[in-house]
Amino acid sequence: MTDTTRSLRDCLAPAKLNLFLHITGRRPDGYHALQSVFQLLDWGDRLHFTLRDDGKVSRVTDVPGVPEESDLVVRAASLLKAHAGATLGVDIEIDKRLPMGAGLGGGSSDAATTLLALNRLWRLDLPRTTLQSLAVKLGADVPFFVFGKNAFAEGIGEALQAVELPARWFLVVTPRVHVPTAAIFSEKSLTRDSKPITITDFLAQRGIDAGWPDSFGRNDMQPVVTSKYAEVAKVVEWFYNLTPARMTGSGASVFAAFKSKADAEAAQAKLPAGWNSAVAESMSEHPLFAFAS
């Protein structure tokens, strides 16, 4: 990352994995109550920010299928500007590297990186708690990325406790299919009554259920998604013969954990031709963590 008084270049918006995802009920406001552990990855979109003196917020790169006015990075910048009364503007460039609609948190991570980067570039010095309160207005996963640490998450994903996770490598396979999150949440067959756990339960029992270190529980959305999307089911089945794996979020990406980069790349080399995949290392902290106190 390059940091100058007028710009911030090459800011990573890291992907996330849900190491498990349990749906424990439905809240009075209609949202589902979740429990999960979020894992940061050293892989994601790259964002570039350049100050404007005219106060305008502008996305200067095209993102197919995402109009500028509805892009989370523009909404995040505009929300922060209005909250803080900032007089400066910004040009935002996005180098999209994460697949969209894959359960990796791409758009949410872009929004969080925007909040953190502009907190520095606009010299706002807002505390992390304030940025997180703004992040909730942008989407359920955005507060986690602003929080900036691997976390045990509850509520709709906004109640976060930092959790220490060991370093490891992941192979992430993303089928070429878009899974609409809202449609999966509305499925009648979706499990909505998983027994609530505590962070102590996770720390004590991880590694037992799925056979890999730090595994725990399941992804309650996975059976629904694999029953409706053959492409996702095919990836899960392929992994079944090699190593334990799990879908992240509402899909479509499926991941497996490995002790080393070499092990992850060896598994990647066995994938059928044409499958979309990436090998990524775990992270313990968001690269812009220091941009909020």
UniProtKB/Swiss-Prot annotation:
Domain of life assignment: Bacteria
Pathway: Isoprenoid biosynthesis; isopentenyl diphosphate biosynthesis via DXP pathway; isopentenyl diphosphate from 1-deoxy-D-xylulose 5-phosphate: step 3/6
Keyword Nucleotide-binding tagged: yes
GO molecular-function term, one example from the UniProt record: ATP binding
GO biological process, one term: isopentenyl diphosphate biosynthetic process, methylerythritol 4-phosphate pathway
Coiled-coil intervals: none
Signal sequence segment: none
UniProt function note: Catalyzes the phosphorylation of the position 2 hydroxy group of 4-diphosphocytidyl-2C-methyl-D-erythritol.
Keyword annotations from UniProtKB, A to Z: ATP-binding, Isoprene biosynthesis, Kinase, Nucleotide-binding, Transferase
Positions annotated as active site in the UniProt record: 16, 141
Reactions accelerated catalytically: 4-CDP-2-C-methyl-D-erythritol + ATP = 4-CDP-2-C-methyl-D-erythritol 2-phosphate + ADP + H(+)
A Pfam family annotated for this UniProt entry: GHMP_kinases_N
Biological classification of the source: Bacteria, Pseudomonadati, Pseudomonadota, Betaproteobacteria, Burkholderiales
PANTHER family: 4-DIPHOSPHOCYTIDYL-2-C-METHYL-D-ERYTHRITOL KINASE, CHLOROPLASTIC (PTHR43527:SF2)
Protein name as annotated: 4-diphosphocytidyl-2-C-methyl-D-erythritol kinase
